[in-house]
Amino acid sequence: MDSLKDHFLIAMPSLDDTFFERSVIYICEHDQKGAMGLMVNRPIGVEVEDLLEQMELYLSPEFVFSLDSQVLIGGPVAPERGFVLHTPQQHWVNSTEISEDTMLTSSRDILASIGSDKSPENFVVALGYSGWSKDQLEQEIADNTWLTIKATPELLFNVEPEQMWLMATQQLGFDIWQMSSQVGHA
């Protein structure tokens, strides 16, 4: 299977795992060893501004815009770890380029910049991540658990989390509710 890096996984309507039900996961890494991604449509009920205060990263005097974005549950693995998906900027301590439109940073310095003129233009903050071991994701796709689409910055950064699953399914080009949950091979 080709790499699904910079793709969205869209949970099938028949997925009965309450944690991943109606989830959209942005795949940050996918290779022969496994996959890592962030769920991008499940708010935890905390605003980014409140998270920064809890971390004692108070808004700087250069604060230039309002923070009304929500912190998301990235997945069940390492829920104490924070991740920021953002538009490209190269000056963070621990950043990885995922695509020409998206980077992943897991260092505290990016959080300290949020809300200032040094902040990335667009960002998503998540706690925890979703991970798959070797061949696990491929098997879940074969089992009809996930559908995939190429990620777009518009969907990642400009759609409210609560609307993302519906918007992502509309990108598929067919009515997802018409799909069978049965898997088979002719």
From Swiss-Prot:
It comes from the Bacteria. GO terms for cellular component: cytosol. InterPro entries: AlgH-like. Transmembrane segments: none annotated. Belongs to the UPF0301 (AlgH) family. NCBIfam families: PRK00228.1-1. This is UPF0301 protein Sfri_2850.
